[in-house]
Amino acid sequence: MGWYSEISRDISKIPTAVQFFETELIQARAECKLVGNVEKSAAQMPGIVEHRFNQLQEIEAILNYLNIELRRLRSSYFKKYLENYQRALSSRDVEKYVDGEADVVDYEKIINEFALVRNKWLGVLKALDQKQWQITNVVKLRVAGMEDASL
């Protein structure tokens, strides 16, 4: 079972999920380095990319879930202000009040933190793409006769 299922059942597991993905990020960054046997690196690339891309997709799904929950929370506050406030408020006024609610602000901070984790993972996927490009070029150089190309 993945982190998406855990968080959708219990939102309090977000800090643990962030810590997990940060730890995985450190390992993923090590996988971005091109050292050692080129053939071995080339053989491992599809599995590495698949694993890390799946992790990125899980982060994206969690982020989407958090945004859905934020919209639900904002909607409940919006409704509260429209129905229970003493004077008539414009939609813009209500929006400003909702944006200032502590729960809404806290949720936006959580979403921002998860978005940062997602952006770091996007960087890892770009680095893995570059690694694949480098492997391809080293192989082409070897085919062209430059056997002494080292990493």
Show which residues each predicted segment covers:
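Extended, charged low-complexity scaffolding/tethering segments
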Residues: 1-30
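Short, charge-rich amphipathic alpha-helices with coiled-coil/heptad character
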Residues: 23-54
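Extended alpha-helical coiled-coil scaffold domains characteristic of the BAR superfamily
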Residues: 42-45, 49-56, 111, 116-121, ...
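Catalytic phosphate/metal-binding cores of nucleic-acid and nucleotide-processing enzymes, i.e., regions
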Residues: 60, 80, 122
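Extended, amphipathic alpha-helical coiled-coil scaffold segments used for oligomerization/tethering
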Residues: 66-110
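Long amphipathic alpha-helical coiled-coil segments
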Residues: 67-75, 106-141
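Acidic, low-complexity, intrinsically disordered peripheral segments
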Residues: 142-151
